[in-house]
Structure formats: structure tokens, C-alpha cells
């Protein structure tokens, strides 16, 4: 994506894959799309089946695991349905953890288990394990 992102304030970023197209959204507006080569489903099973850190689904690092996100991530959600633009806009600030199609929902607000685990708010058990030196920022209000 050839877009400069303004820093110093919160952004809502979403990626939606419908089996043919990958669409990227910023604050509810589509900013990029690309047709995928082979289509089909995306396999995220490595996120939950105990592979080594280098092989797992990760939030805030590149697939090559050498580059890490430099900023704050308030929440992350994984759906097994392609969300519409209207659904993305409606869910920018809040989504019901029991919503149909929501398979993982993590809030990075400092509410963790004793071992640092961030609980999956959906109840599906896809809990997240922080890696490295994590700083949590609590009491953030959705600016949208």
C-alpha cells in the first residue's frame, strides 16, 4: 500500500479476505485491494496448535519475524466471515464478543492472566501469549 499513515493518533485498520480479494481498510474506508492468485481459504490453524514461535500466527510482527510493529495495538479480532464495509464501520469502537463469525477477540488493555496470557474474549480459547517487552495502555477511549 502506497499510503502514508499519519502518526500521533489512533487508527482503525482492517483486512478482509473474501476468497478472491484481499481488501484493506483504514478508519472504515477501503484504501487498497488485490485479487489473490489461488483463492480459497486462509489457514490460521498454526495460531493455536502449539507450533514454535517462528511458525505461529502473530499480531504486530512481519511474516519473516524480523520486523516488529512500533506503536500501540488496542484490540485485534479474527473473523471467519468477510465483513462488509458497513459492518466494519459499525464495529470500529465495539463488537459483541459473541457475534456470529467472530473466532478470536483480544483486548490489549493490560487485563491478563498471571502468566501474561491475554484471554480470547469470544470464549473460544484462542488466548494470546505476549512475546518480548510489552507495555499495556489502559483506559483508552475509542476516538471514532
Pin down the residues of each PLM region:
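Extracellular/lumenal carbohydrate-interaction signature centered on repeated Trp-anchored short motifs
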Residues: 2-11, 16, 49-53, 65-72, ...
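Extracellular beta-strand elements of beta-rich domains used
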Residues: 13, 73-78, 120
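Extracellular glycan-interaction patches encoded by glycine-rich segments
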Residues: 47-75, 83-91
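Extracellular/lumenal ectodomain signal focusing on beta-strand-rich modules
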Residues: 12, 56, 75, 104-105, ...
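Extracytoplasmic low-complexity segments
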Residues: 48, 89-144
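Extracellular glycan-interaction surfaces
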Residues: 1-44, 63, 131-144
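Acidic glycine-/aspartate-rich tracts in secreted/extracellular proteins
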Residues: 19-21, 29-30, 63-64, 78-87, ...
Amino acid at each position: 500500500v502506497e499510503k502514508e499513515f499519519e502518526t500521533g493518533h489512533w487508527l482503525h485498520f482492517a483486512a478482509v479476505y473474501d476468497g478472491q480479494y484481499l481488501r484493506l481498510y483504514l478508519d472504515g474506508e477501503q484504501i487498497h485491494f488485490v485479487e489473490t492468485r489461488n483463492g480459497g481459504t486462509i489457514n490460521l490453524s498454526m495460531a493455536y496448535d502449539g507450533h514454535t514461535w517462528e511458525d505461529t500466527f502473530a499480531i504486530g510482527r512481519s511474516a519473516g519475524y524480523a520486523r516488529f510493529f512500533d506503536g500501540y495495538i488496542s484490540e485485534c479480532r479474527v473473523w471467519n466471515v468477510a465483513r462488509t464495509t458497513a459492518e466494519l464501520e459499525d464495529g470500529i469502537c465495539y463488537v459483541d464478543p459473541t457475534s456470529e463469525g467472530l473466532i478470536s477477540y483480544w483486548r490489549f488493555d493490560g487485563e491478563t492472566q498471571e502468566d501474561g496470557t491475554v484471554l480470547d474474549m469470544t470464549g473460544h480459547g484462542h488466548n494470546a501469549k505476549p512475546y518480548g517487552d510489552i507495555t499495556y495502555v489502559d483506559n483508552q477511549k475509542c476516538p471514532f
